[in-house]
Amino acid sequence: MAPSPAEFSDQQQPAPHRTVQPPGVGYIPTDDERRVFRECNEESFWYRSLPISAVSMIVTQGLISRGILTTSSRFGSLPKVAFAGLCGYLAGKVSYMKTCQEKFKRLENSPLGEALRQGYRNIPTQYPSGTSEFSDVNPKTASPADGFASNVVEPPSSVYSSHHNSTSDTVPFSTSLGESSPSGISDNIAPEPAALLEDTPKRKPMTYDELRSRNRETYEMAVTQRADAPVRSSLDRAARKDVKTNKYGDVWEE
């Protein structure tokens, strides 16, 4: 018996996707999930934590024996070796986390596995791509020409010319030919006080002959001072020779 059109449409309709809420704090894992937890704990210890911890402890002990790392005076090399083993244990657990997640994602009828699969595969629909909450343009009414026209940048030359015209209109230039500056600017300039200009004494111009005679006088004065200096020094020396002094430099009077 051939299926009816209604039954055929029901068979062609895909099953609705079941969304699973992420497990909370009070989530109780299923038996399969507990089994995977135990497997992950054992495998991460034997396959990752133990080998990495052993290698770290051996390398640390080798560095201590060569003198690269110093030992404690009380406990010896035990603190550094134990710390290296702990770091290796934690590194092994962290490195096995990706493998454990893959095991949970392969589980069927597992809320935890379904949550992991949705987190890695689906994109949240509450953040649709291509729209912005700050955009005010309606996508149904906006056209490509409008968007292109709104993004056109005005050239610098036109901006400068429009700004220059606006500023030139606001400044009131005078219409007379004798004035080259705006009348509004020239009116604000304070005139210089005439009294100060009149009080300043005017220097009399000096001729070439006057300057020559002044230089000659200064030269003659310098020559006479130089000629008097040797005479004074010779007189002082003669006076010093006539005066008798003792061995201490004191003047000896007879």
UniProtKB/Swiss-Prot annotation:
Biased composition (Basic and acidic residues): 199-219, 234-247
UniProt xrefs under Pfam families: OCIA (PF07051)
Alphabetized UniProt keyword annotations: Endosome
Ranges for region Disordered: 1-28, 124-254
Top-level taxon of origin: Eukaryota
Location(s) in or outside the cell: Endosome
Subcellular location, principal: other
Every OCIA domain range: 1-114
GO cellular component entries: endosome
InterPro entries with a match to the protein in the record: OCAD1/2, OCIA_dom
Compositional bias per record (Low complexity), positions renumbered to this chain: 157-168
Keyword flag ATP-binding: no
Positions with biased composition (Polar residues): 124-141, 169-186
Protein family according to the UniProt entry: Belongs to the OCIAD1 family.
Name of the molecule in the record: OCIA domain-containing protein 1
Lineage per the UniProt record: Eukaryota, Metazoa, Chordata, Craniata, Vertebrata
Gene expressing this chain: ociad1
